[in-house]
């Protein structure tokens, strides 16, 4: 599974500043069980996640426009 990492409480995608290779996104992705993480459109994108890992969008969470 792949997708944008998400804050489970707010429903918002995890933000990043440096597009492309990004150590924070890579670490966050690894912590979620993913194989690769990088910054895509200023949000952390992850590959190799398990199907049970929440990614954006989370049903019922609107992110309050963030």
Swiss-Prot record:
Enumerate the UniProt keywords alphabetically. Disulfide bond, Ion channel impairing toxin, Neurotoxin, Secreted, Toxin, Voltage-gated sodium channel impairing toxin
GO cellular component, as recorded: extracellular region
Q: What Pfam families does the annotation carry?
A: Toxin_3 (PF00537)
Superkingdom, natural source: Eukaryota
Q: List where the protein spans the membrane.
A: none
GO MF annotation list: sodium channel inhibitor activity; toxin activity
Asked whether the UniProt record includes Phosphoprotein among its keywords, one would answer no
Kindly list the places in or outside the cell where this protein is found, as annotated in its UniProt entry.
Secreted
Tell me, in one coarse class, where this protein mainly resides: secreted
Query: Is Heme one of the keywords?
Result: no
Residue span, LCN-type CS-alpha/beta domain = 1-64
Q: Name one GO biological process term.
A: defense response
Q: In which tissues is it expressed?
A: Expressed by the venom gland.
Intrachain disulfide bonds:
12-63, 16-39, 25-44, 29-46
Q: Which family does it belong to?
A: Belongs to the long (4 C-C) scorpion toxin superfamily. Sodium channel inhibitor family.
Report the protein's function.
Probable sodium channel inhibitor.
Further comment: Negative results: has no effect on Nav1.8/SCN10A sodium channel from the grasshopper mouse, a species pain-resistant to C.sculpturatus venom.
Q: What is this protein called?
A: Toxin NaTx-4
The scientific name of the source species is Centruroides sculpturatus (Arizona bark scorpion)
